[in-house]
A protein has these predicted regions:
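Self-maturation zones of extracellular/virion spikes and adhesins
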Residues: 1-85, 102-104, 108-115, 160-166, ...
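Residue "hotspots" at secondary-structure boundaries inside conserved domains
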Residues: 88, 138-141, 199
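Generic structural signal for coil-to-beta-strand starts
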Residues: 15, 72-73, 95, 147, ...
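Noncatalytic modules at the cell exterior or secretory-pathway interfaces
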Residues: 199-212
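Small/polar residue-rich beta-strand/coil "junction" motifs that cap repeat-based extracellular fibers
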Residues: 77-79, 89-99
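Exposed aromatic-hydrophobic patches
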Residues: 192-198
Length: 236
């Protein structure tokens, strides 16, 4: 530097000082980097068509924050490779998506005959979506402790008169009666129960949908996405 006002010096206190144009702009110790000035800024990249990232190198697991240049998104994810396991993505319009956030929607594509001797698990054979793959064998399993919202619609037909139709959320050791309908005095009952609830769950707790009745004679749970479905997602 011709006028000797730009320098990198090692002080006697084991600190490296960086000065540009006569102004201290940064200090570096064995565990800390401090940027000085009125508007300190760190720029990663040079406007080229390339990905840029910061990797946090943990003992058991790495994480990254970076720019996915091909998609023009800022991503936060697991691992050192950008975009391999994205937990959160921010696009150029400020829209945020969470590709691994627990969220599912399943429905019946065929009817299910039910007898009146036992409470019956409602089965689901079609997944519209299942982020994080937490739903299987008609049961949702919570991957983490939190508050979960569940909603369901159950269509039923040929329930005999003089009794009740009851739909339950069965959550591990808890049973939540979410819908009850009197069968009335008709020879048969056609109906739909639509229900929703927010439930506190621990990791590995499960939730499934059940139906029961005290009417005489068998009945059926109807199919089709708009009649019998089950959905849920992590709230907080």
């Amino acid at each position: 530097d011709a006028d000797a006002d730009t320098s990198i010096t090692a002080d006697t206190d084991d600190q490296v000082d960086i000065r540009v144009g006569g102004t201290d702009v940064a200090t570096l110790t064995n565990s800390n980097l401090v940027l000085k000035g009125t508007t300190p800024t760190v720029t990663i990249g040079d406007a080229g068509a390339e990905d840029a990232k910061i990797v946090f190198d943990g003992n058991a697991q790495d994480y990254h924050i970076g720019l996915d240049d091909s998609a023009d998104t800022l991503v936060i994810g697991k691992g050192s490779a950008l975009g391999t396991t994205t937990s959160m993505s921010f696009d150029a319009n400020g829209i945020i998506t969470k590709p691994l956030q627990p969220c599912f929607f399943v429905y019946k594509s065929s009817s299910q005959d039910v007898d009146t001797t036992n409470t019956t698990d409602i089965t689901f054979d079609t997944e519209r979506f299942d982020l994080n793959s937490d739903f299987g064998s008609n049961v949702f399993t919570a991957p983490v402790t939190g508050k979960y919202h569940f909603s369901a619609s159950v269509g039923y037909v040929n329930a005999q008169a003089g009794g009740n139709i009851m739909v339950y959320f069965q959550v591990s050791n808890a049973e939540i009666l979410a819908h009850r309908k009197d069968a009335g005095s008709d020879d048969s009952v056609y109906g739909t129960g639509q229900i929703s609830v927010v439930i506190d769950m621990d990791a590995s707790d499960t939730c499934k949908l059940q139906i029961d009745t005290n009417t005489d004679g068998d009945y059926a749970v109807e199919s089709a996405v708009y009649r019998t479905y089950f959905s849920g997602y992590l709230v907080a």
